Amino acid sequence: MQGPSLSQLVLVLMGALLEAGTPREEVSSTPALPREPRTGTEGLIFHWDWNWPPPGAWPPGGPQDPLCLVTLNGTPGNGSSPFLWVVGTLSSYEQAFLEAVRHARWGPQDLANFGLCPPSLRQAALPLLQQLQAWLGEPRGQRLVVLHLEEVSWEPTPLLKFQEPLPGEASPLELALLVLYPGPGPEVTVTGAGLPGAQSLCPTRDSGFLALAVDRPERAWRGSGLALTLRRRGNGASLSTAQLQALLFGADSRCFTRMTPALLLLPPQGPVPMPAHGRVDSMPFPQPRLSPEPEEPLPSTDPFLETLTRLVRALRGPPARIPPPSLALDPGALAGFPQGQVNLSDPAALERLLNSEEPLLLLLPPPTAVTAGVPAPLQGPVTEMWASSLARRVATEFQSAAAELRGFPGLPPTATLLLARLLALCPGDRGDPGGPLRAVLLLKALQGLRTEWRWRERSGPARAQRSAGTAVSNGPCALRELSVDLRAERSVLIPETYQANNCQGTCGWPQSDRNPRYGNHVVLLLKMQARGAALARPPCCVPTAYAGKLLISLSEERISAHHVPNMVATECGCR
């Protein structure tokens, strides 16, 4: 009997590889626990005559998995299951979970299937499961957001980090459920910063799912992730890493892999596409602006102030959309600072301001001190000294600061025109009592902008290093994300990259509650530094706590998995 030809064998092998699909990006912090297999379209019903939105209707930078219309069992139109809008990938694991919730009657068998403890104990997840069941029966156009696990670390406590949802899909929420697919393990009590108190899980041999209620789901994709603390019910003993992995990430014997958790979010009802006569009346997404500009301020009656505002925004960038924080001033604290009244018409006071490039804080009187909303006039006439020698010096300072600003590379093209207009508007008419105030405002603004752009010029290489994750941040000492590439380590097979984190920021006095574990030694050093004492090594931001990492490596022609301590920075502090 003649065997298959070589070309047929090659085609068969290529077909097998194509059926296997392209492997998805692995979870960097779970090398021994790969993600679930690629999901086919089994159980996802796509009707042939549905008019889906074109690819351009989805916002750029959105998730790889668009909004899908699915059903759970049955075909559309036969009344067996309503249409469900799902944002994200609905794998076979989540599909089985939704099927189980839909058909549950919440008897003892169903409680055991979801790992719920006896009804005598308070179950935070049970009302949410029943609410999800009601949504599956009558979706009312609401979308179900499915977030998959991106990263996990096991020590000192499990930290689960999930995908970040689209803007507007995570706040506010009607429901947030953490769904786990368990393996063998004991009954446990689970606590965590994102959970509404302690919750009990009672898995049995018949348990296919575990569900935890989440009241602050944003912790699942911000920072280091959702922290879970599991202890045995009764004696409160902690579980080992192997026990945690076996319980939380059950094994899928058919695919030789582990089943990773998912976070299900149910935002409130909103306007969504609705089917009608085999068509979809789609509501396209608004095209996002790449560089959102702030709302233009109300036109000012003073062209000088309007031009100065435009110059500052052009050189410093648009302000944030959040409202500016109010400056709470403590009168007792202000009493300790050098202060005094400054007469802006006094040449000596203006000369002191000219000699200093420090920022200027102007405290305006409260609205009650101004009669009928009319600004109080400046006191004191404009002297001849201001009109002669001091005015020339102010003009010289203006021209010097403006010339230096024009010479900085990367200056916006509108800055030169705004500078020329400001110099023409200031100090104004000789008889204008606001001339000295305008001169001070313009001078301090130009000095501040010049100082900032000088710093940008000097720290250009440092910013390039900071983009690579090697420079120190200007904020307070805190934990920053840092990805480490292990591909240069030839002995390490998995993971290729992982989130190691790093500590960056400044150490100053007083220490804040960001780093509550500071010691007396660093407090004394920071106080000495604040008094101007020279220190050979000033306090710096360093990791103060670490977690281990599971690595799969190749050594002497053997593949081994071992736990390496102190691989992930979990806390930072000044030392």
Swiss-Prot record:
Sites carrying sugar chains: 78, 343
GO CC list: extracellular space
**How is the protein modified post-translationally, according to the record?**
Preproprotein is proteolytically processed to generate N- and C-terminal cleavage products that homodimerize and associate to form a biologically active non-covalent complex. Binding of the non-covalent complex to AMHR2 induces dissociation of the pro-region from the mature C-terminal dimer. The N-terminal portion of the protein, despite having no intrinsic activity, has the role of amplifying the activity of the C-terminus.
- Does this entry carry the keyword Nuclease? no
Instruction: State any single GO MF term.
Output: growth factor activity
Q: Where is the signal peptide?
A: 1-20
Q: Name one GO biological process term.
A: negative regulation of ovarian follicle development
Under the heading Gene3D superfamilies, the entry gives: Cystine-knot cytokines (2.10.90.10)
The record's listing under PROSITE patterns reads: TGF_BETA_1 (PS00250), TGF_BETA_2 (PS51362)
> InterPro entries, per this entry?
AMH_N, Cystine-knot_cytokine, Muellerian-inhibiting_factor, TGF-b_C, TGFb_CS
Q: Report the subcellular localization.
A: Secreted
Q: Does the keyword Nucleotide-binding apply?
A: no
Name the protein family. Belongs to the TGF-beta family.
What protein name is recorded for this chain? Muellerian-inhibiting factor
